[in-house]
């Protein structure tokens, strides 16, 4: 008979009330000392594990918890430290310097964790790295929980194939050699766990879902080298986010268990299971509860799915678990959450997903009748949610059906539009601008809280927003920026703001998830059809424009980013949701243009993150993503300039799609890529308007004029001068005013110097 256990891959770090964020930021500001900070982090770690124990999870992970990022943890443990930080002597200072930068050294690059909204710190390889195990965090965490709670846990570490695949600074042909150099470190780390009596370790290898058959075979050799040195420690090879194509090779790995995602695999893992079976002597860790979305599971449907898996895989032991780490969903339903009852009851966060696993285990062990009450409650909650969502339906479907090809394209080509826009806008060569947001001071946050608590009237709050907007319009004019922004002081988050103002969205107060470092976001919940209600940005943008003779950009978040940064409904396709959002935003774009705004920016920073992991699935997504953007923007006059912005992406993968957006100007986060995108542009020119970020806004460091001038000069070597823009990487909301003004002053001066040089060349 098959033994059934519940397992988890990872749990949110941030705490129910973002205590983790607050502890980090207090330490960075110097308002708490290191001992206090480490104690706070330890308490949060213990609390996260205790929650999983209390939910009766049989196999609880450790070392998924981190002070910043689990990939950075792995790098630092292996002494994988960039040269510019090796002079630092304190381990904690070094760790945070890599993530955040210091005065004389820029931070390491940050990019998306596969196709999620989580960002990891990219390890930087160079041949001078002296690999050694400097810390066994897995052992420390295992001991800490054993001491505190007396329970066995499952240490987690990023595997050698995935870790090196996610790194940069080496040629592709060098990857295998670097992976092999890491093998002795993995062996040392795992043997120390084995000597401690650890029973299971989880080695995460999500990169195997995108690996070629050759690479899966190569990774198998790594595991053969590692596990041949072990005797009693069981290794779980964990994959997630999709299926593994080289399945037959995967199930032959010399490990004691294999984790597969049966939620986001498009049914492929189950088909592989049916075709090739599964080793009966290995544990099958089946991801059957969605680790990335927030909707309550249909327990009967999920139970039947697990029984289907069991009927095929005659394994001695089955672990049921989330499809991925629960890092990507909120911690738990907050007792003070304000959502409508039928909506709230239809949601399931990390803690609730663990309860679903426990119920499924009971159904598997004792039979479906044993959880009949839970099954019926889940069905009732799902049906109530469906009825609630139906009540919010709109006329969108009819409008979408009436769209024609002309609704998805501008009337004339870019080159013709450019001439008209140059004449209409009257901008200088190498125009300077910012991406949208300016620092949200304590005063801004306090004003928003007073308004939300009804301590301030709408009029009081609007007067404050207007005053802050005017102050920053004046600052921008003093800095001599060419195209201004209103600063977005009325917005807490670029997606949240629109989620609150469009029909079909619900907005939470406490459903926070980690985006990067201490930054947490509350993704809107798309539960029904999305519909435009009334203008959302026109009033604030028009007010800002009234204060200056320079152009002020209208600022919107694009349909694909709103989709990808929300928790979308799961009863219709993502394409249909994106088109609904695009149609709603199209009306906002038209309202801005009708109000006299001549430059409108529609940000799509998350376009790439929505890519399916397998390249064979890309075309379908990229086609409808570009169509959704053009649906948003194509109704404007030829003289109206459409901008878009992207960040944290491997742009090389989507350059054709960027072109298909048909935006007049795209601004791109660039400084943390350390010139990588410029190298690409040398051989793949981009001929529309382009602004490559000249400084990193994620760091408090103020770059010099010379540094930014050099970046501009390097860019102009491969980019057309007459359509190049100068801008920071991203929005400046999280920065302080002093450093923002100083950096922008240097940026404008760098642009002036580059402009003068180009004028002399002409």
Curated annotation (Swiss-Prot):
This is 5-methyltetrahydropteroyltriglutamate--homocysteine methyltransferase. Pfam families: Meth_synt_1, Meth_synt_2. Induction: By superoxide. Coiled coil: none annotated. Belongs to the vitamin-B12 independent methionine synthase family. It comes from the Bacteria. 5-methyltetrahydropteroyltri-L-glutamate binds at residues 18-21, 112, 519-520, 565, 609. Catalyzes the transfer of a methyl group from 5-methyltetrahydrofolate to homocysteine resulting in methionine formation. L-methionine binds at residues 435-437, 488, 603. In response to oxidative stress, Cys-719 can react with bacillithiol (BSH) to form mixed disulfides. S-bacillithiolation leads to loss of catalytic activity and methionine auxotrophy. The gene is metE. It catalyses: 5-methyltetrahydropteroyltri-L-glutamate + L-homocysteine = tetrahydropteroyltri-L-glutamate + L-methionine. The modification S-bacillithiol cysteine disulfide is found at residue 719. GO terms for molecular function: 5-methyltetrahydropteroyltriglutamate-homocysteine S-methyltransferase activity; zinc ion binding. It comes from Bacillus subtilis (strain 168). Pathway: Amino-acid biosynthesis; L-methionine biosynthesis via de novo pathway; L-methionine from L-homocysteine (MetE route): step 1/1. Binds 1 zinc ion per subunit. Its cofactor is Zn(2+). Its EC number is 2.1.1.14. L-homocysteine binds at residues 435-437, 488, 603. The active site is at residue 698. Keywords: Amino-acid biosynthesis, Metal-binding, Methionine biosynthesis, Methyltransferase, Repeat, Transferase, Zinc. Zn(2+) binds at residues 645, 647, 669, 730. One of its GO terms (biological process) is methionine biosynthetic process.
